[in-house]
From Swiss-Prot:
Cellular component aspect of the GO annotation: ERMES complex
Name assigned to this protein: Mitochondrial distribution and morphology protein 34
Signal sequence region: none
Keywords, comma-separated and alphabetical: Lipid transport, Lipid-binding, Membrane, Mitochondrion, Mitochondrion outer membrane, Transmembrane, Transmembrane beta strand, Transport
PROSITE patterns: SMP
Transmembrane segments: none
Compositional bias per record (Polar residues), positions renumbered to this chain: 425-441
Domain remark text: Lacks alpha-helical transmembrane segments, suggesting that it resides in the membrane via beta-sheet conformations similar to those predicted for other outer membrane proteins and porin.
Originating organism: Chaetomium globosum (strain ATCC 6205 / CBS 148.51 / DSM 1962 / NBRC 6347 / NRRL 1970) (Soil fungus)
Protein encoded by which gene: MDM34
Superkingdom assignment: Eukaryota
PANTHER family linked: MITOCHONDRIAL DISTRIBUTION AND MORPHOLOGY PROTEIN 34
Protein family membership: Belongs to the MDM34 family.
Length: 537
């Protein structure tokens, strides 16, 4: 099968060359240019030459009167040439610094000044060899696809041919640029040129559509808003709006719609979102609202931590408190810890929270004289200071006020110093002496009492056991403080109190007496001699 391939009509048409130069100029300036080229690349001359390419048919896929599809092998080594014109940067230091960040450059002054030189490049002696897929249609034009890189070699002639390294640099750069041009841009250029030859009506449509798209613009002054306001929110006169123009100055930029401004303000006052229907969240501070003029809420002083108090709870219905009456008379709080919440006679002691009060105060030594005084002195003090409390019966829920313990003066303590040596007076005393009489400067507060009913008579056996265990509960018991018989109308709480006090006092005296008998010399004041290792020499 033979084909007649006429090359002369392409080389003789002047309009074809003009159209080809424009397409090549657009294609060369589309991709990023190297930093050395500082101006646009313009195609000044383009000629296909008189030698046509050699085509070899490898495969025919479709053949008809108006279409053709096949695979060809093309070889070209003709006299076609292409001339380009541009401007280049002759100072390599300026080119290097322009392609790097400012903070990494040494910032030279005169050495980095720009020096641009016009450059003219001529491309000739093209040698091409490629496999081409060619598709032709009268309605769609000619489409060519290169299956491999078609460029084998070419000759680059420029203004700097006398400078060897510039010529080599231009040769490498232009060859790489043309390889990309053949693979990407040349098929599109050939397709558009084929449309100009066989389908001129489609060329006119493609040229008109972009122009129409560019011409149609939006004029904001053609249809101004009905409630037009300026930047300050003042209404504008419609006659004044018609006099405005897009190029008239800043007045055209101050034309706003009042509704638009209201909606924009709603967006600003909402949750900083584009949705006007966002539900409002109370007591929330957004980061976008906090500017440099806002108060920094992160440095505010946190709220003071509430003071914590430890409380002790017991199930005992009675409370016994021993306080320092001498300190109360002086108008100060007692430094001795108080005894609170006694559960029963067999329960342990619980100290109050007064151990940290008056920490800087000097500690006083309390000495309790356990020896019994004369009954006459105790009786007179009891008759003068103790009120009658037998007839008063307060409710059980009433709290018991503390029973103060008198504090002896320093002179009395010096005269009545307790010695635990063996003496005839101490041998005549019983093993468990009773607690000393309680003398008070203030009247005693009545204690809760329970009236024993006439019908509520305890059984005989339990009363005998109780009398044997606590002799103080016997009706004929004589009080150690007053010497008078204690009536049966005393409450059980008073009996338990006296029993517990007697038990504790006797236990303390017994332990002291046992320690004294076990080690008689322990309580004597004597100076021990130091051990031999620490004797003075």
């Amino acid at each position: 099968m033979a084909f007649n391939f006429n090359w002369s009509p392409l080389t003789a048409d002047a309009g074809f060359y003009k159209r080809a130069r424009d397409l090549l100029t657009t294609a060369l300036n589309k991709s990023p240019k190297p930093p050395i080229i500082v101006d646009d690349i313009i195609v000044t001359e383009f000629n296909l030459g008189s030698v046509p390419p050699d085509l070899e048919i490898l495969e025919i896929g479709d053949l008809a009167e108006d279409r053709f599809r096949g695979i060809f092998k093309m070889c070209y080594s003709g006299d076609a040439f292409l001339t380009l014109k541009t401007r280049v940067q002759a100072n390599p230091l300026n080119t290097c610094l322009s392609a790097k960040p400012d903070f990494t450059s040494p910032q030279p002054l005169a050495a980095a000044s720009s020096l641009t030189i016009p450059l003219q490049i001529t491309l000739s002696e093209f040698k091409l060899s490629a496999f081409i897929i060619l598709v032709f249609s009268k309605q769609k034009g000619l489409t060519i696809v290169f299956r491999n890189d078609p460029l084998e070699s070419l000759k680059v002639s420029s203004t700097f041919d006398s400078i060897q390294f510039v010529r080599d640099y231009l040769q490498r750069t232009i060859e790489g640029k043309l390889r990309d041009l053949f693979m990407d841009e040349l098929p599109a250029i050939i397709h558009r040129l084929s449309l100009q030859l066989w389908c001129p009506d489609q060329i006119a449509k493609e040229d008109e559509e972009p122009k129409e798209a560019d011409e149609h613009g939006v004029n904001p002054l053609a249809t101004p808003p009905l409630d037009a306001v300026d930047l300050h929110g003042h209404l504008l006169d419609p006659a004044a709006i018609s006099e405005l123009s897009l190029d008239g100055g800043p007045e055209a930029q101050l034309l706003f719609s009042q509704k638009t401004l209201l909606r924009l303000s709603d967006i600003t006052n909402s949750q900083v979102t584009s949705s006007l229907d966002t539900s409002e969240t109370k007591d929330v501070l957004f980061r976008a609202w906090a500017g440099p003029d806002k108060v920094d809420l992160t440095n505010t002083t946190p709220l003071a931590t509430p003071s914590l108090a430890r409380s002790y709870s017991y199930t005992s219905p009675h409370t016994y408190t021993f306080s320092d009456n001498g300190s109360q008379d002086q108008g100060s709080l007692p430094s001795r810890p108080s005894l609170v919440h006694l559960n029963s006679a067999t329960a342990g002691l619980s100290l109050g929270s007064g151990r940290h009060s008056k920490a800087g105060r000097k500690k006083k030594t309390r000495v309790v004289n356990l020896r019994r005084k004369a009954e006459t002195e105790a009786n007179s003090e009891e008759e003068e200071d103790t009120p009658e409390t037998d007839s008063i019966e307060p409710p059980m829920s009433e709290p018991i006020m503390p029973h103060p313990i008198l504090e002896e003066s320093d002179e009395e303590l010096a005269s009545n110093k307790v010695h635990f040596g063996r003496s005839p007076d101490l041998q005549q005393q019983p093993r468990r002496p009773s607690f000393r009489a309680q003398a008070t400067n203030a009247p005693e507060v009545p204690v809760p009492s329970v009236e024993l009913g006439k019908t509520a008579v305890p059984p005989l056996q339990s009363s005998e056991k109780q009398a044997a265990r606590f002799p103080s509960q016997d009706p004929a018991f004589v009080d150690s403080k007053t010497g008078r018989p204690r009536p049966r109308s005393d409450t059980s709480s008073v009996i338990l109190e006296q029993a517990w006090i007697m038990k504790m006092a006797g236990e303390i005296a017994r332990r002291v007496y046992d320690e004294k008998n076990g080690n008689p010399t322990f309580w004597d004041d004597q100076d021990d001699t130091p051990p031999p290792a620490y004797e003075a020499r």
